[in-house]
């Protein structure tokens, strides 16, 4: 159905929101890692931050790509080009 179709620009807002959520979570994890005195917990928190970093980067890249996809002046990220 046509009303269920999402444009690339609308999709870019979803990617941006996802990136914002990931960024906030990473800030929370960094704070928790700084505040804990348990070395094992700190290690787990830091590891989780490292695992989230590529997801955040990808969400940011895809937000830009989908927002600018039809702009002829935009130089697309080769990582996402077929």
Model regions: which residues?
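Short, charge/polar-rich alpha-helical segments
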Residues: 1-23, 31
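Short, charged, amphipathic alpha-helical segments
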Residues: 13, 39-54
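Amphipathic alpha-helical coiled-coil segments
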Residues: 26, 48-71
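Secondary-structure edge/capping motif, primarily at the C-terminal ends of alpha-helices
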Residues: 29-40
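Long amphipathic alpha-helical coiled-coil segments
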Residues: 40-41, 65-82
């Amino acid at each position: 159905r046509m009303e269920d179709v999402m444009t690339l620009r609308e999709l870019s807002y979803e990617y941006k929101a996802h990136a914002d959520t990931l960024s906030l979570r990473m800030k929370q994890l960094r704070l928790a890692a700084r505040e804990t005195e348990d070395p094992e917990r700190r290690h787990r928190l830091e590891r989780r931050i490292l695992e989230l970093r590529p997801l955040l980067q990808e969400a940011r890249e895809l937000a830009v790509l989908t927002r600018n996809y039809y702009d002829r002046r935009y130089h697309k990220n080769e990582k996402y080009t077929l």
